[in-house]
C-alpha cells in the first residue's frame, strides 16, 4: 500500500499477534512455524508481490535476471502424504490407487487444460479484469456453481480425487469444494502450472 501511495489504512488482525497462518513461534529455544503458507515464485502478473519480495530483500537482480534468496526457498519434495501405511512424495494420492482413479486424474487434467485454453487464468486474478475486459463468459459460468457441483457434473467422483481437490480448496481459500466456486477451484491449478496426472508428460 505504501509503495502504491496509500498512507491511510487500518490493518485488522483476528489474533493477539499478527501473522495468520504464517505466524511462527519458539519451541525449546528454536524458531518454528505454527502454520504454513508459501508463495509460489511470482509470475509477471504479480508485480506487487515481486516488489514486496524485493523490498524485503528476498530477491535481487543479478546479471539481468532475478535471483531469490535460497534461505527462503522450499525445494522438492515440498509435501508428503501418509497413505496406505507409507509416505509418498506430493499430496495427490498415487500410491496404491487403481486404474479408475488414474483415469479420473487424467480426465481432470484435460478439463483444467480446456478451461485454461478457453480464457486466461492469472495470479493475482484481479489483473485480468477491468471495465473494458470483464470476466470471460466461460469463467462466469464456472463462478456461478460450486467446485463440488461442477466436479459432480463432470463425473469426477473418485474419492481420492475428491479428497485432494477439497484439500486444495481448504488450503488456499479456507473453505471446501462445496463452498468454493468452480472458477476458484480450477484457478488453483490453472494460475500456477496446471494439473498433471501421474505419468503424463509435463510441457
Task: Enumerate the predicted regions with their spans.
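Short coil/loop linkers at secondary-structure junctions
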Residues: 7, 57-59, 155-159
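Short, solvent-exposed loop/turn segments at secondary-structure junctions
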Residues: 16-17, 87-88, 169-171
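Dinucleotide-binding Rossmann-like beta1-alpha1 core, especially the glycine-rich loop
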Residues: 30-118
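Short, solvent-exposed loop/turn and secondary-structure capping segments
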Residues: 21-24, 50, 92-93, 180-181
Amino acid at each position: 500500500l505504501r509503495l502504491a501511495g496509500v498512507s491511510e489504512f487500518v490493518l485488522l488482525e483476528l489474533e493477539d499477534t499478527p501473522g495468520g497462518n504464517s505466524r511462527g513461534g519458539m519451541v525449546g529455544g528454536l524458531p518454528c512455524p505454527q502454520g504454513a503458507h508459501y508463495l509460489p515464485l511470482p509470475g509477471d502478473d504479480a508485480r506487487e508481490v515481486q516488489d514486496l519480495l524485493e523490498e524485503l530483500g528476498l530477491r535481487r537482480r543479478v546479471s539481468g535476471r532475478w535471483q531469490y534468496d535460497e534461505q527462503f526457498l522450499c525445494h522438492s519434495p515440498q509435501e508428503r502424504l501418509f497413505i496406505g501405511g507409507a509416505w509418498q512424495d506430493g499430496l495427490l494420492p498415487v500410491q496404491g490407487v487403481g486404474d479408475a482413479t488414474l483415469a479420473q486424474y487424467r480426465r481432470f487434467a484435460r478439463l483444467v487444460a480446456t478451461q485454461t485454453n478457453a480464457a486466461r487464468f492469472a495470479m493475482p486474478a484481479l489483473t485480468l479484469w477491468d471495465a473494458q475486459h470483464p470476466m470471460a463468459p466461460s469463467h462466469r459460468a464456472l463462478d456461478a456453481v460450486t467446485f463440488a457441483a461442477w466436479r459432480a457434473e463432470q463425473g469426477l467422483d473418485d474419492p481420492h480425487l475428491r479428497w485432494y481437490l477439497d484439500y486444495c480448496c481448504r488450503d488456499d481459500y479456507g473453505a471446501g469444494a462445496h463452498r468454493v466456486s468452480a472458477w476458484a477451484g480450477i484457478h488453483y491449478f490453472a494460475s500456477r502450472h496446471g494439473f498433471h496426472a501421474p505419468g503424463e508428460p509435463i510441457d
